[in-house]
Amino acid sequence: MREYGYESLSYGMSMTGAVYMQKLEDRVVELASGGVSYFKFDGLFGHLNIRDFELQGRGTAAMPQLGLEGFSSNDERLNDSRYDELKIYYLTAGTERLMKIFNRLGEVNPDIFIAITNGAYLSPWWLQYVDVVWLINAGDAAKGNNRNGELVYRDNVYHQIWKEENTKFPMNSVFNHEPKKTGPDETPEAFRDYLYMNLSRGTGFIELYIKTEKLSYSDWDILADGLKWAQKVFPLFHNVRMHGGSPRDNEVYGYSAWNKTQGYLSFHNPSEKEQTYNVMLDRSLGLLPETDMVYHVSSPLGSVGSRVKASYRYGDMLSLTLKPGEITVLDFTNLASSFSSLGNEGISSICD
């Protein structure tokens, strides 16, 4: 790109280069004008643990007093704090340039959807300009030897960010590299349970990581059912929150989201022993205290049977015994006609 007059760095392009950034703006605005309604900006300012900085003063401050002769834009020596001011100048100028591009896209289409999946951090400030931000926990793929381990790895990051650190960022506006399905080496039940637990996090931006040639007919059916469920409960996602204990400590945990007429609760027992979990249906889960209505219970994972009551009100205690590795999702609605019939079998959803 350099030979064509574009400002390049060691790893990628300069986010403050006048020629390159104007070309980028012109092109994405052209695409938006042609009907493209989704943009994913990835690799901004580098990628994962690699960072690229503008050292030549192109569109940002130059600091020759730092003696940068012989430095590359991703030089490890830039980790020294004496270069922080220069790096801040570049990141600030580059971010301001991106803001102008995001605003231009919004002018073309107010409903345009923008994901910034690198070069950002979990601050609600970003949501003035974009719709979702990558979780940025340096783990594209959730680690673990099985689905249970994958869920614990990612859900523990959620627990750390929202329960331990109390980060003020809406959970539905984060992006993960999930759900994934890359092979046939699991039962349909294991994939189903993993999928619904994953979706119950309330991520408003669901990007599938699948190898289509590896999916069976049942996998496609499960995927379709899961996405239909996510679409049904999507209006609840902006209220989603985490409940329960620590995934890392093998305590029962899950996610909860409600509005005035419906809600859901997911549960995961990551341990190798049976556990009984008690939770009160109140404001801490997101229920509205002024709502005096009966919520009927069903489950997208099967019949709810006698393990929970057929209906609940605000302030009721829900008690559920979960088998080792079990996943359960409960739907609550005050419209009796919209939930599946209650059977005699319990929910049995073991994540292998």
Where are these regions (language model features)?
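C-terminal beta-strand-rich structural cap/linker in extracellular carbohydrate-active enzymes
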Residues: K309-D352
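Aromatic- and carboxylate-enriched substrate-binding clefts and catalytic-loop regions
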Residues: M1-F169
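Short, basic/aromatic beta-hairpin or loop at an interaction surface
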Residues: E76-D80, L301-V308
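Active-site-adjacent structural elements in folded domains
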Residues: E7-S14, R248-V252, G315
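Active-site-proximal substrate-binding groove within the catalytic cores of carbohydrate-active enzymes
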Residues: Y90-G305, M317-V329
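Generic beta-strand structural signal
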Residues: G35, W258-K260, Y312-R313
